[in-house]
Amino acid sequence: MENRENLVEIPIEEEVKQAYIDYAMSVIVGRAIPDVRDGLKPVQRRILYSMYEMGLLPDKPFKKSARIVGETLGKYHPHGDQAVYEALVRMAQDFTMRYPLIIGQGNFGSIDGDPAAQMRYTEAKLSPLAVEMLTDIDKDTVDFQPNFDDTLMEPEVLPSKFPNLLCNGTSGIAVGLATSIPPHNLTEVGNALVKLAQNPQISVDEIMEILKGPDFPTGGVIENFAQVKEIYKTGRGIIKVKGKAHVEKVQGGRERIVITEIPYQVNKAELIKKIADNVRNGKIKEISDIRDETDKEGIRIVVELKRDAKGEEVLKKLYKYTPLEKGFPVNLVVLIDKEPKLVDIKTLLREFIKHRLEVILRRSKYFLKKVQDRLHIVEGLLKAINFIDDIIERIRRSKDASEARNYLMEEFGLSEKQAQAVLDLRLQRLTSLEREKLLEEEKELREKIEYYKKLVASEGERIKVFIEETEELVKKYGDKRRTFIGGVKEVKEGSITVAVLQDGSIIPVEELPLEKAPVVNILRVPFTEGLFLVSNRGRVYWIAGSQALQGSKVSLKSREEKIVGAFIREKFGNRLLLATKKGYVKKIPLAEFEYKAQGMPIIKLTEGDEVVSIASSVDETHILLFTKKGRVARFSVREVPPSTPGARGVQGIKLEKNDETSGLRIWNGEPYLLVITAKGRVKKISHEEIPKTNRGVKGTEVSGTKDTLVDLIPIKEEVELLITTKNGKAFYDKINQKDIPLSTKKSIPRTRWKLEDDEIIKVVIKKSE
């Protein structure tokens, strides 16, 4: 019978799950996602390190790409040779890399999509910036790990003085994960790094006054700076990039369009083909001819127009129907401590600074030890020179080097290394001039030791070195921005009034179009900020303020889902209050929220329950939680404990049969409350009519009618309301509390707004919200 003692039985579903996780992490860490420190994937790092070991420096001759690929495969990357060669080619293409890391000789492909020549025909060597990434790698600045067969050691990461991740960007698709980081301008990145190193507390807004956005190798135009700002705060989004084109007048009164720059990663040949296809299918009828006049001076695509065709109108069509305008997806996913993370632009900069400070620390320790070792030898030599006659005499009488070395150690107190250095001393070093040189060297070594000790002991000193090195790098390699970014000045102070609809639409308005309904809220949104939208299904959606410029819409998860509230984070406080239909309330810190356009759950709802209202949370205030049947519970915000997104919340009001929560308001000491019913009736009562109690009670009846209680609004002097009805009507009303007589909770409200028989008020919005 088979021996089963050494067998371990594992359920197949567990084994499959673990195997898949292992495979996914292998792809994420070992193939697709770059390390935040040097911005390289393993194959890129191994190619560069192999070339460095081969001595392929910028001032050295080229070597065949096939030789480089073979060296990389044989030593560090035992995978397909074509995959390695493709990675090498991409690092040499100036239309792919903003700052190429490899200098190529031969055919390395083109922006038209032409493939590179076979590796046996092309040659390559490292670029100066690649050398900057590898500098100090031999000074114990980074950790090394065994290669695939444990015969060699390879670096886990490069020292990377050059901020490659941001300057060159990257893209990659892993298992269930992807990254897409655009390239940037070295001068801007370097200046932003210096600014952040000097002041770690600066905001993303302040960073982006320096680092304005992507700088693509192919140029192009990004018109909306606000959009870029929001994406760099959240780490995710799509940046619209346009090709650069202008209209020229030609003979005969005609016009033509000349395209001189195209969006990043757009195939020029495919762009021309797409334009031609649109001419053939009739979408763009005004074009008579297309020519590609691109040469070594740059891209030039000439689009000839028919007589009477307006160049600007045709250009709009080119942007609309062809890849002359393209969305670049941004997904700032990187490996931090070997774990994939979605980060903002500040985190990318901060992690690079952290890496460089670690490199400087390790390099300083390395040099400190070297200098201390040298000082030890120099001290021994100086001691020996003072007694050189006795030493020479004794060495002559010694049987061998070992006896002479032992004599020096015992007689003069030298260490073994010092004694050996004395034995290795050449006779010419015994002159008085050489002694002076040793004394001078000793002085210099002691000064260096003090310097390196200061670097090791003080992070502030290391930051100074980092700033100096970064400024030197920018001075040496920095260049002008290629991609134009528009709207930088206007965005800083700009804002827009938007109406948030129940279906998730964001409509920009100067005054709300009354035919647009049902409206959830009207807000003045700064371009540099954004909106959180909360749905009845307990999800919160994020939308950038810049996206509201042309109108936008969040993608809700189902037809039953609708938006019930919206707010601007910067004007809302630190915590959000939610009220559910079944009488529950929940307080959740805004720090728990993620900037996700696809939404994230923020409350656990039971079957049949849903979120009906939201409000800002301030501990010193009271919650007014009211039901459709007109009951109100008033209790302190402090009675609702803060909880995580996965929690249900706590009971706020005890509901009677067939009753449900209508909404909640925050009472902040206002003397009066407006009671508003579905049939357009309003009354004013004193806040004292609703005594403060604990949460979880039945509450006080305040409506004085069987009509549904729609809202309960605290008022001090005056309030402006936007009223929307179930039939889609909307109107404004400004109410001064002096115009409404004081009533009691049992009084019947008076009709203020005359509605149709089948019409009821659905939403009441305080305009200040």
Curated annotation (Swiss-Prot):
Temperature dependence, free-text field: Optimum temperature is 70 degrees Celsius, active between 37 and 90 degrees Celsius.
GO biological process, one term: DNA topological change
Catalytic center residues: 121 (o-(5'-phospho-dna)-tyrosine intermediate)
Listed SMART domains: TOP4c
GO MF annotations, alphabetized: ATP binding; DNA binding; DNA topoisomerase type II (double strand cut, ATP-hydrolyzing) activity
Reactions that this protein is recorded to catalyse: ATP-dependent breakage, passage and rejoining of double-stranded DNA
Domain of life: Bacteria
InterPro entries linked to this entry: GyrA/parC_rep, Gyrase/topoIV_suA_C, Topo_IIA-like_dom_sf, Topo_IIA_A/C_ab, Topo_IIA_A_a_sf, Topo_IIA_dom_A, Type_II_DNA_Topoisomerases
Compartments (UniProt record): Cytoplasm
Cellular component GO terms, alphabetical: cytoplasm; DNA topoisomerase type II (double strand cut, ATP-hydrolyzing) complex
Domain comment quoted from the record: The C-terminal domain (CTD, residues 494-769) contains 6 tandemly repeated subdomains known as blades, each of which is composed of a 4-stranded antiparallel beta-sheet. The blades form a flat, toroidal beta-pinwheel fold, to which DNA probably binds. Unlike most CTDs, this organism is missing the canonical GyrA-box. The isolated CTD does not impart writhe, DNA wrapping necessary for supercoil introduction. The ability to supercoil DNA is recovered if the CTD is swapped with the CTD of T.maritima (residues 482-804).
Protein task: A type II topoisomerase. Despite its similarity to DNA gyrase, this enzyme is not able to supercoil DNA, and instead acts like topoisomerase IV. Relaxes both positively and negatively supercoiled DNA in an ATP-dependent fashion, decatenates interlocked circles. This the first bacteria shown to not contain DNA gyrase, although it has 2 copies of a reverse gyrase that introduces positive supercoils. Type II topoisomerases break and join 2 DNA strands simultaneously in an ATP-dependent manner.
Subunit structure: Heterotetramer, composed of two 'GyrA' and two 'GyrB' chains. In the heterotetramer, 'GyrA' contains the active site tyrosine that forms a transient covalent intermediate with the DNA, while 'GyrB' binds cofactors and catalyzes ATP hydrolysis.
Alphabetized PANTHER family for the sequence: DNA GYRASE SUBUNIT A, CHLOROPLASTIC_MITOCHONDRIAL, DNA GYRASE/TOPOISOMERASE SUBUNIT A
Similarity comment text for this entry: Belongs to the type II topoisomerase GyrA/ParC subunit family.
Alphabetical list of NCBIfam families matching this protein: PRK05561.1
Name of the featured protein: Type 2 topoisomerase subunit A
Species per Swiss-Prot/TrEMBL record: Aquifex aeolicus (strain VF5)
Lineage per the UniProt record: Bacteria, Pseudomonadati, Aquificota, Aquificia, Aquificales
Gene name in the database record: gyrA
